[in-house]
């Protein structure tokens, strides 16, 4: 993906960059694969904020993505590569020989006209989907299932991938980009290749207003709040936080405390913890 940089003609354009959308082949999505999507603004079913700094933003339609890739042994042809406002990766519209149309995540190297297929006997080429046990060691994969038939859960964002490093009985060992090494059942499916749009992380939005279009609200420092709103709040002028260590808004230590549940079932499947 190419990045388009702007000249500093205004303060908002200074250092701003956007995607050049050179890979996008159409601006009109498939209408039958769109559903309405109401933004929850970070609230749960009780109306309480569970994710801070969310709200507003432009209205979007949700694209139904085929994460399961369970249409076995039916060849599909790539019709379009499209922009998806709900994720960092691009998506591809697939026309199958039986007439069905589905969206999939667009991997790097996928172009209009290519043919893809899912199934145990599928070839090892970009965008084909197979069980992990049928994929050679050393192959990079994305959209990886953690439970057979549930659909891909790992490596779905722009530029993401995992590498198969070995096999152990009914498990396959994957190395994630974070450095974590994890066991996954060999019957779980994965798609060959890495997600495209890998330059997404280089985009500079240039001004706060573009973040507001995405539904991201400002992050206020705790020291700028009142003491009833944050442990760092209060004091005269620019006062220090007045604590031995930084605190979360709920009064817990914000640094050096492990947040993962010790009794989480998947702990047994993690061979090496992430390094970053």
UniProtKB/Swiss-Prot annotation:
Residues 252-276 have a biased composition (Basic residues). One of its GO terms (biological process) is cytoplasmic translation. Keywords: Ribonucleoprotein, Ribosomal protein, RNA-binding, rRNA-binding. One of its GO terms (cellular component) is large ribosomal subunit. One of its GO terms (molecular function) is transferase activity. It comes from the Bacteria. Residues 221-276 are annotated as: Disordered. The keyword Ribosomal protein applies. InterPro entries: NA-bd_OB-fold, Rib_uL2_dom2, Ribosomal_uL2, Ribosomal_uL2_bac/org-type, Ribosomal_uL2_C, Ribosomal_uL2_CS, Ribosomal_uL2_dom3, Ribosomal_uL2_RNA-bd_dom. Pfam families: Ribosomal_L2, Ribosomal_L2_C. The keyword Ribosomal protein applies. Part of the 50S ribosomal subunit. Forms a bridge to the 30S subunit in the 70S ribosome. One of the primary rRNA binding proteins. Required for association of the 30S and 50S subunits to form the 70S ribosome, for tRNA binding and peptide bond formation. It has been suggested to have peptidyltransferase activity; this is somewhat controversial. Makes several contacts with the 16S rRNA in the 70S ribosome. Belongs to the universal ribosomal protein uL2 family. This is Large ribosomal subunit protein uL2. It comes from Onion yellows phytoplasma (strain OY-M). The lineage of its organism: Bacteria, Bacillati, Mycoplasmatota, Mollicutes, Acholeplasmatales. The gene is rplB.
């Amino acid at each position: 993906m190419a990045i388009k940089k702007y000249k500093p003609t205004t303060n908002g354009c200074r250092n701003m960059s956007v995607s050049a959308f050179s890979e996008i082949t159409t601006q009109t999505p498939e209408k039958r694969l769109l559903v309405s999507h109401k933004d929850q603004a970070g609230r749960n079913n009780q109306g309480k904020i569970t994710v801070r700094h969310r709200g507003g933003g432009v209205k979007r339609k949700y694209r139904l993505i085929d994460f399961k890739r369970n249409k076995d042994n039916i060849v599909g042809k790539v019709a379009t590569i499209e922009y998806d406002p709900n994720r960092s990766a691009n998506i591809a519209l697939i026309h199958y020989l039986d007439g069905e149309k589905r969206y999939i995540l667009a991997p790097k190297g996928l172009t209009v006209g290519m043919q893809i297929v899912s199934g145990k006997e599928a070839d090892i080429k970009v965008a084909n989907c197979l069980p992990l046990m049928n994929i050679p060691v050393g192959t990079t994969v994305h959209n990886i299932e953690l439970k057979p038939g549930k659909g891909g859960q790992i490596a779905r964002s722009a530029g993401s991938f995992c590498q198969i490093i070995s096999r152990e009985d009914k498990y396959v060992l994957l190395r994630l980009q974070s450095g974590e090494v994890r066991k996954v059942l060999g019957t779980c499916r994965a798609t060959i290749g890495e997600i495209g749009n890998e330059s997404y992380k280089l985009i500079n939005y240039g001004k706060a207003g573009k973040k507001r279009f995405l539904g991201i609200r400002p992050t206020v420092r705790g020291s700028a709040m009142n003491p009833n709103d944050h442990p760092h709040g209060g004091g005269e002028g620019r006062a220090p936080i007045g604590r031995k260590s930084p605190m979360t808004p709920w009064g817990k230590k914000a640094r050096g405390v492990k947040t993962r549940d010790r009794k989480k079932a998947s702990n047994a499947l993690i061979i090496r913890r992430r390094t970053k």
